[in-house]
UniProtKB/Swiss-Prot annotation:
The record's free-text note on cofactor binding: Binds 2 coenzyme F430 non-covalently per MCR complex. Coenzyme F430 is a yellow nickel porphinoid. Methyl-coenzyme-M reductase is activated when the enzyme-bound coenzyme F430 is reduced to the Ni(I) oxidation state.
Key words, A-Z: Cytoplasm, Methanogenesis, Transferase
An annotated GO BP: methanogenesis
Annotated positions binding coenzyme B: 373
Pfam families attached to this UniProt entry: MCR_beta (PF02241), MCR_beta_N (PF02783)
Described purpose of this protein according to its UniProt entry: Component of the methyl-coenzyme M reductase (MCR) I that catalyzes the reductive cleavage of methyl-coenzyme M (CoM-S-CH3 or 2-(methylthio)ethanesulfonate) using coenzyme B (CoB or 7-mercaptoheptanoylthreonine phosphate) as reductant which results in the production of methane and the mixed heterodisulfide of CoB and CoM (CoM-S-S-CoB). This is the final step in methanogenesis.
Major localisation: cytoplasm
Name of encoding gene: mcrB
Any one of the GO CC terms: cytoplasm
Name listed for the protein in its UniProt record: Methyl-coenzyme M reductase I subunit beta
Source organism per UniProt: Methanocaldococcus jannaschii (strain ATCC 43067 / DSM 2661 / JAL-1 / JCM 10045 / NBRC 100440)
Record localization: Cytoplasm
Length: 447
């Protein structure tokens, strides 16, 4: 039983195709503090590791370990790792498991070419952070390969390099054949950023380019991180819950309604007009005053809900604009000018009170311009360029990358192939919207 209800808000929940699932669900049923699916998702993100057994076999056969351009001639090992995937998986499970009834899970995928490892929660409980998942799995995997193929002490370092790449001298594990959704803790921008350390392409790959699920996954991780960072606390908790509900989970079918209204002939500007109309209809904003020119200014009736509506509109604008182009490159300018137009049109603050718009200025430069260091898909909420918005800027990027028709050099297929193959085989990673709604229905009557 949840001891107290803080907010009177209720939402209607829809699936990824815009079909009503449940009406009048308490807002707190989708809170990371109460929703069992979100809690499981966060836990599984931390304890799940993707292993590329075919990649390890190829690295050892060619001597190409430690990243691009690193090849050690004369140190090749021809080991039939994929052929013996079941033996290796059994050994890894034996080493990783703590007790017979714990939640350890080892799953071979794609005829043994890849493997999903979920370490037991007990190992996570006695760790300070999530590195334990990769490091324990890697150690068990190295031992399994060494024991299975009787690798001697002189060749064992090659097994290490094939599994962990350049680690430990390269802390990002460049060239490794093991991966987690969360990036290295050593790359965190500051305290509390860990759950935001997932590139947009990973969300796209995990959900197999399903727009609504990718947006949901991104929003869940970004907004759950706000609880860790201390942003979604006190007066600001409701703002973040509404943002998660409307932008991430398509509450009241707002995102899909806006896309339907503008999908055929719409632009970013017409999406803005639709958001304003819907907000007026729903009593979220109201007319404030009319200037001598006839221009109308608005004021919020509920500022947190206005932000949620604006954030949902931002995702809709991304879907309409990037979807029309079949390309993701314009997502930075879409985030920027959606907010710019919205502010000029209404006199109200843009998404996240200007932080999404400000993020988009730097995002435009660093994904285009004279720098152009990476496409939109490689950015995340922990990136120095895109960290500034409090959870509202990454979901539209995930939407845009789902709609890209192969125009990106940094495509999900290039950056997230292993992650996508392994994590998409796990239901709640592939269809987070469905399972978060299921979790909300489990707890709604207890609130």
């Amino acid at each position: 039983m949840i001891p107290m209800v803080k907010y009177k808000d209720t939402i209607n929940l829809y699936d990824e195709k815009g079909k009503l699932v449940e009406e009048n669900v308490p807002l707190e049923a989708i809170s990371p503090l109460h929703n069992p699916t979100i809690q499981k998702l966060v836990k599984d993100v931390k304890r799940t590791v993707a292993v590329n057994l075919a990649g390890i076999e190829n690295a050892l056969r060619t001597g190409q370990v430690g990243g691009k351009g690193c090849m050690i001639k004369g140190r090749e090992l021809d080991l039939p790792i994929v052929e013996n995937a079941e033996t290796i998986a059994e050994y890894v499970e034996k080493v990783v498991r703590v007790s017979e009834d714990d939640d350890t899970s080892i799953k071979l995928i794609n005829d043994g070419k890849q493997m999903a490892v979920q370490i037991p929660s007990k190992r996570l409980d006695v760790a300070a952070e999530y590195s334990v998942s990769v490091l324990v799995t890697a150690q068990a995997l190295k031992e399994a390969i060494i024991r299975t193929f009787d690798v001697d002490i002189f060749d064992a370092p090659m097994v290490h390099a094939a599994v962990l790449g350049g680690y430990p001298h390269e802390v990002t594990m460049k060239g490794s054949n093991i991966a987690a959704l969360l990036g290295s803790p050593l790359s965190l921008e500051g305290p509390g950023y860990a759950l935001r350390n997932i590139m947009a392409n990973h969300f796209v790959a995990c959900t197999k380019k399903n727009v609504m699920n990718a947006v949901a996954f991104a929003a869940i991780m970004e907004q759950t991180a706000m609880f860790e960072m201390g942003d979604a606390v006190g007066l600001f908790e409701r703002l973040h819950l509404l943002g998660l509900a409307y932008q991430g989970l398509n509450a009241d079918n707002l995102v899909i309604d806006l896309v339907k209204a503008n999908g055929k002939n719409g632009t970013v500007g017409t999406v803005v007009a639709s958001v304003v109309e819907r907000a007026l209809e729903d009593g979220v904003i109201k007319e404030d005053k009319t200037l001598p020119s006839g221009f109308k200014l608005y004021k919020p009736v509920d500022v947190a809900k206005w932000n949620a509506y604006a954030a949902a509109g931002l995702v809709a604008a991304a879907i309409v604009n990037c979807g029309a182009a079949r390309a993701a490159q314009n997502i930075a300018s879409t985030i920027l000018y959606y907010n710019d137009i919205l502010e000029y049109e209404t006199g109200l603050p843009g998404v996240d009170f200007g932080r999404a718009e400000g993020t988009a200025v730097g995002f435009s430069f660093f994904s285009h311009s004279i720098y152009g260091g990476g496409g939109p898909g490689i950015f995340n909420g922990n990136h120095i360029v895109t960290r500034h918005s409090k959870g509202f800027a990454i979901p539209p990027v995930a939407a845009a990358m789902c709609l890209d028709a192969g125009t990106q050099m940094f495509s999900p297929e290039r950056t997230s192939a292993l992650v996508g193959t392994v994590f998409s085989a796990i239901d709640e990673f592939r269809e987070p919207l469905k399972y978060v709604i299921k979790g909300a229905l489990e707890v709604k009557d207890k609130i």
